């Protein structure tokens, strides 16, 4: 075995569906300053208030989608890891989670102890956000520095418009799109508008523009989450030949009362159901592995909401998971990181 590891990093999951484990996970997640970017005292107070009721609610949601093998997100990421082994001849392939287990700092320390000296760190997020990519990269850097680990790292950059990534999306979704349907909704994870505003030095971010950041500087395009989501959706629709009007974009998983980027997925589900859409396909291209946000929020609650609004059928298109084309594409992108 050589000394160059591939480390696939995803968001994470509670250890179980118990309220205690969910509370512990939510506390770690929400106290990350890249997730709730407020001063520590305010963040601590807000998270403490959230943790009064949210753990029990979330535990019920996790229980509704939990597999015999464990958390779908963790299980699917491990399946991806297993598939990647034959595509990475340079050393071990490991997974880590930003929150929960296996913890990123512990995995880095274990790799160093095994004699690994180079790590290709692959945050499994197609689009850039401080609350996903930056927090992973900064924690890795902090861990290596504080624990004095003899590791060199290279980072897989966001790949939201990489032609091979779009090809992988197309390959995984094609069986669903070849069936009859009325509309395709591409639902991305949402973000508070302030997360984008603080990265835009111009102060002129247009959150309603259909071509968000299209003509902005390369530096701005590299950090504009909304613009990258729109670019992913447009590239995918063009790849699949989906006409304008038959697809749209929305943003899900809003937390709290702050203004988040729009349109909200729950609003679009109502609008589409009331507009006469009967069979709705939903893809979630911000996630590469199915998780509570796809399986429960869209596949269960979203389906119920759409039907109540007048729709007849909502079909959740699976994420990339361990699709062979995605495995091939990810291996190639990591090789060239």
Curated annotation (Swiss-Prot):
GO CC, alphabetical: cytoplasm
Membership in a protein family: Belongs to the ferrochelatase family.
Chain's gene name: hemH
Protein's name in the database: Ferrochelatase
Protein EC: 4.98.1.1
PANTHER family noted in UniProt: FERROCHELATASE, FERROCHELATASE, MITOCHONDRIAL
Binding site for Fe cation: 189, 293
Classification of source organism: Bacteria, Pseudomonadati, Pseudomonadota, Gammaproteobacteria, Pseudomonadales
Main location: cytoplasm
GO molecular function annotation: ferrochelatase activity; metal ion binding
Keywords, alphabetical: Cytoplasm, Heme biosynthesis, Iron, Lyase, Metal-binding, Porphyrin biosynthesis
Coiled coil: none
Gene Ontology biological-process entries: heme biosynthetic process
């Amino acid at each position: 075995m050589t000394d160059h590891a591939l480390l696939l990093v995803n968001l994470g999951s509670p250890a179980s569906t118990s309220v205690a484990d969910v509370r512990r996970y939510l506390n770690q997640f929400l106290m990350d300053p890249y997730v709730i970017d407020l001063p520590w005292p305010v963040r601590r107070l807000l998270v403490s208030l959230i943790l009064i009721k949210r753990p029990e609610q979330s535990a019920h949601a996790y229980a509704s989608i939990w597999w015999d093998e464990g958390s779908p997100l963790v299980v699917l990421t491990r399946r991806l890891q297993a598939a990647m082994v034959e595509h990475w001849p340079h050393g071990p392939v490991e997974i880590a989670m930003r929150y929960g287990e296996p913890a990123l700092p512990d995995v880095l320390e274990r790799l160093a102890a095994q004699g690994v000296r180079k790590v290709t760190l692959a945050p499994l997020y197609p689009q850039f956000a401080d609350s996903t990519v930056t927090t992973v990269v900064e924690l890795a850097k902090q861990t290596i520095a504080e624990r004095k680990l003899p590791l060199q790292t290279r980072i897989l950059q966001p790949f939201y418009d990489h032609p091979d990534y779009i090809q992988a999306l197309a390959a995984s979704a094609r069986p669903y799109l070849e069936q009859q349907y009325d509309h395709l909704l591409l639902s991305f994870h949402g973000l508070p508008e302030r997360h984008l505003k603080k990265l835009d030095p111009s102060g002129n971010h247009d959150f309603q523009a259909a071509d968000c950041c299209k003509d902005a500087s390369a530096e701005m395009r590299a950090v504009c989450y909304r613009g990258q989501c729109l670019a992913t959706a447009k590239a995918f629709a063009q790849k699949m030949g989906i006409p304008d009007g038959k697809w749209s974009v929305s943003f899900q998983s809003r937390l709290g009362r702050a203004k988040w980027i729009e349109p909200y997925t729950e609003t679009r589900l109502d609008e589409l159901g009331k507009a006469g859409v009967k069979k709705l396909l939903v893809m979630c291209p911000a996630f590469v592995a199915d998780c509570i946000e796809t399986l429960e929020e869209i596949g269960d609650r979203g389906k119920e909401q759409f039907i109540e609004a007048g729709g007849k059928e909502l079909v959740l298109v699976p994420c990339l998971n361990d699709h062979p084309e995605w495995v091939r594409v990810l291996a190639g992108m990591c090789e060239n990181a």
